[in-house]
Amino acid sequence: MDKGAVSPLMLKAHNDAMREGYILQVEDSADDAALTRHALRRANISNRVELLKDGVEALDFVCRRGKYSDRDAGDLPAFVLLDLKLPKVDGFEVLKNLRENERTASVPVVIFTSSREEKDLRKAYELKANSYVRKPVDFDRFTEVIRQIGSYWLSLNETPYEGRK
């Protein structure tokens, strides 16, 4: 077996350790969304990804409004992968609403953005983001970063709620 290969036993242990639940991705770039799904598959992370394409749709989903009004109140994601530069309502407003909503206040939120602005980093943490990760431009690095994010939030991190489906 080559040095970088993963044994079937290690792969089974990795998959067994992955928490059930879905990833809520709020991303307006179809390319970045597709790349994220591809990276998760390459990392053997098979959790469902619920993709929302703008801030208004994300707020409707989280607040169970409009076409999402009949969502189960206990249906919470394992974590949220949130872009900042979104149409209609930006990622900061989505994050603020997640934190102000008692039901979603403890859901982990990973800011995943191309922003290099120090003020964005600072504001994300002021609004209680759990993590701030800059999107790598390089494909292999992007894939590795998504693998690390998924592995951490789905297998190592523990949350105080049981609402995962």
Indicate where each model-derived feature is located:
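Active-site residues of response regulator receiver
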Residues: 83, 113
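Residue-level signal for the "D+5" position in two-component response regulator receiver
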Residues: 51, 86-89
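Short amphipathic alpha-helix used as the core "switch/output" element in two-component signaling
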Residues: 67, 92-105
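Alpha4 helix (beta4-alpha4-beta5 surface) of REC/receiver domains from two-component response regulators
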Residues: 34, 38, 93, 116-133, ...
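Conserved acidic segment of CheY-like receiver
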Residues: 21-31, 36-41, 80
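C-terminal output helix
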Residues: 57, 137-150, 158-162
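Glycine-rich nucleotide-binding loop
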Residues: 1-8, 57
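Acidic catalytic/metal-coordinating carboxylates
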Residues: 54-57, 75-78, 90-96
